[in-house]
């Protein structure tokens, strides 16, 4: 994490794991949307209709809000019933139980930004109650293998048996400890960013990363050049904010799955940094504690919001020519539109569609060397409760904290399907693996 630099011509290169410089020449939920409902409405609904029905009525009001809608797939906070919003009727429908419940539960969890479904079951609406929902959707089981969203494979039906699907998704994006608020560019504290990990090669911190689960880490592809591909020399450190903390949990690396479209790995002379994304599969699973927790992915179709202030964290250099931070740093920076970031005063058309910029036009606070691969997270409540989502991966930039040269990030929402496919396809792989 860097303060403003003294070298206006400097680039984010470095001898360890620098961010490479580029070459020269139907309504979606938004990252960090925050639904707001008056306490009077909530209290009235709870009193008049009961908690179950009120919860869905409240969610319906939020989803229909013109400003900050909830996501159209939700889990009931009471009994984990999976429900989908019917925009035509303006109501929630349950998913009729089928032989494909496991796959449907997995698709629903993934669509909401959870990594996977941990369990599923079914309930009878006649005994469990409708709880504010109205009717059913049935699943076209033949379309499931290619479906990316539940809406791709569901239609209104009668569901004669009256049995509906429930699901338990892997929890994510929530702190387990109460924390104080810190405003950018300062030391962090234990438990604030429990998904942040340190990737170290021969004991040296080279990159950051984000826990998606106890055994999968998302980071940047450029952290693994040819010189750093002996996986037995990599270690992943989690559960600490001080780089020398004796309390950190460390594990080895079984496999690295990197994007086959990351061009510098094909030809080192290429300076085009699209697809700068990689998954690290750990040799075993980390214990999840109040200091070690996974982050959520963006929900399917979730868009970035220009101007939204989110948080980047890392142990990178505090200045371009400075030393790496000994304590995890955090900074709140706003998302900059690609139109602005591609203007001649900024990066002049070097920002590709699957990238985005974040920072202040005047500079002053930014990610830097050693922050590469680390998380850019945004908080929202589109899943009914406040969660942090991994919206970006620290990728590249010119200098550190320079005016009109903000940090550039891999746009995670554009790689959701790549992530899910890589995890399912390469869970038993070892070594360096390419995923198209």
Swiss-Prot record:
Intervals, Cytoplasmic compartment: 1-38
EC number: 3.4.21.106
Tissue note: Detected in kidney, in thick ascending tubule epithelial cells (at protein level). Detected in kidney and liver.
The keyword Repeat appears for this protein: no
Superkingdom of the source species: Eukaryota
GO biological process: basement membrane disassembly; cholesterol homeostasis; cochlea morphogenesis; detection of mechanical stimulus involved in sensory perception of sound; epithelium development; negative regulation of apoptotic process; negative regulation of epithelial cell proliferation; negative regulation of epithelial to mesenchymal transition
Full protein name: Serine protease hepsin
């Amino acid at each position: 994490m860097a303060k403003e630099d003294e070298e206006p011509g400097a680039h984010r290169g470095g001898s360890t794991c620098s961010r490479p410089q580029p070459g020269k020449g139907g309504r979606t939920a938004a990252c960090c949307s925050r639904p707001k409902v008056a306490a009077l409405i909530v209290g009235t609904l709870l009193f008049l209709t009961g908690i179950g029905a009120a919860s869905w009525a409240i969610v319906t009001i939020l989803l229909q809000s013109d400003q900050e809608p909830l996501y159209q797939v939700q889990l009931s906070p009471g009994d984990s019933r999976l429900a989908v919003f019917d925009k035509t009727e303006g109501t929630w429908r349950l998913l009729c139980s089928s032989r494909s419940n496991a796959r449907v539960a997995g698709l629903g969890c993934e669509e909401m930004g959870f990594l996977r479904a941990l369990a599923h079951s079914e309930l009878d609406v006649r005994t469990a109650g409708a709880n504010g929902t109205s009717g059913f959707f049935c699943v076209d089981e033949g379309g499931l293998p290619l479906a990316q969203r539940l809406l791709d494979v569901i239609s209104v039906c009668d569901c004669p048996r009256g049995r509906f699907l429930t699901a338990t998704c892997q929890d994510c994006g929530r702190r387990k400890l109460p924390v104080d608020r810190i405003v950018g560019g300062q030391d962090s504290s234990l438990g604030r960013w429990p998904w942040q990990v340190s990737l170290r090669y021969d004991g040296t911190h080279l990159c950051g990363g984000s826990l998606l689960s106890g055994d999968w880490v998302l980071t940047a592809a450029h952290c693994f050049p040819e010189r750093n591909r002996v996986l037995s020399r990599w270690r992943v450190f989690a559960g600490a904010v001080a780089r020398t903390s004796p309390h950190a949990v460390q594990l080895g690396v079984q496999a690295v799955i990197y994007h086959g479209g990351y061009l510098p790995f094909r030809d080192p002379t290429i300076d085009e940094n699209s697809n700068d994304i990689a998954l690290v599969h750990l040799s075993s699973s980390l214990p999840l504690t109040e200091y070690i927790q996974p982050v959520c992915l963006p929900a399917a179709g979730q868009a970035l919001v220009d101007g939204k202030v989110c948080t980047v964290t890392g142990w990178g250099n505090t200045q371009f020519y400075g030393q790496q931070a000994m304590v995890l740093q955090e900074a709140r920076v706003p998302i900059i539109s690609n139109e602005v970031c591609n203007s001649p005063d900024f990066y002049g058309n070097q920002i590709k569609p699957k990238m985005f910029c974040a920072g202040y036009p005047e500079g002053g606070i930014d990610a830097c060397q050693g922050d590469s691969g680390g998380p850019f997270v945004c908080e929202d409540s589109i899943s009914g409760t406040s969660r942090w989502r991994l919206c970006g991966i620290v990728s590249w930039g010119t200098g550190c904290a320079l005016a009109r040269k903000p940090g550039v990030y891999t746009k995670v929402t554009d790689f959701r399907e790549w992530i899910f496919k890589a995890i399912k396809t390469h869970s038993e792989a070892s070594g360096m693996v390419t995923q198209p």
